[in-house]
Regions:
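Conserved small/polar residues in nucleotide/adenosyl-binding loops
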Residues: 183-187
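Short, acidic loop-to-helix structural element flanking the phosphoryl-transfer center
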Residues: 75-103, 109, 113, 139
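Short secondary-structure boundary segments
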Residues: 106, 180-182
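Acidic di-acidic motifs
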Residues: 16, 160-161
Length: 187
């Protein structure tokens, strides 16, 4: 029996990835001296939180770039003002069935809080687990949730959107449901 459903944030709760890429590029570009930062350069740092991503992209002066990122990210969030249709209703239905709801994201605490506030979801989750600057820590966060709630892996499901989400789930023995919620044009 499922007792805990955990969600990823970027690409699962909302279409925030394009905005994240633009905000990161805008924040780090003034601090990169050798080359322009490409979208690919940024994508290669995914799995780390924004502090780790920016440190890797900028090196020296990363603190200033990180401060800039938070300002830019909050300003740009108008590009993604709400979660995917049906997400908040799904969470409410699960809660009515007494299922625990968690958020496990690679984002750092501050950018996660900005997004949840923008989506008016800052009180939706029983627990929020964020990323770290050194490595993808989702498997570790899953283990912590299982321990916190004294659950077995088969009592938890994670809803994510990347191959790395599947890998992290398999590492811990929990099921991963893959979300493909991106809006596409009719053409």
């Amino acid at each position: 029996m499922i007792k805990l459903v955990a969600f990823d944030l970027d690409g699962t709760i909302g279409d925030t990835i394009p905005m994240c890429l633009k905000a990161l590029k805008k924040a780090v570009t003034p601090y990169v001296t050798l080359n322009d930062v490409s979208e690919n350069d940024i994508l290669e740092t995914f799995g780390l939180n924004e502090k780790g991503m920016i440190k890797k992209l900028v090196g020296y002066n990363w603190e200033n770039a990180l401060d800039d990122f938070y300002v830019i990210y909050e300003q740009m969030h108008i590009m993604c003002p709400r979660p995917f249709d049906g997400i908040t209703e799904l969470i409410e239905k699960l809660k009515k069935k007494s299922i625990l709801i968690a958020l496990v994201t690679g984002k750092g605490e501050k950018s996660c809080a900005i997004t949840l506030r923008q989506f008016n979801m800052d009180t939706c989750f029983d627990k929020v687990k964020t990323g770290n600057p050194f490595k993808n820590n989702k498997a570790e966060n899953f283990r912590e949730l299982l321990a916190d709630y004294k659950l077995q892996p088969d009592e938890m499901i994670y809803i994510g959107d990347t191959v790395s989400d599947i890998v992290s789930c398999r590492e811990v023995g929990i099921r991963c449901l893959s979300a493909c919620l991106l809006y596409t044009s009719p053409s």
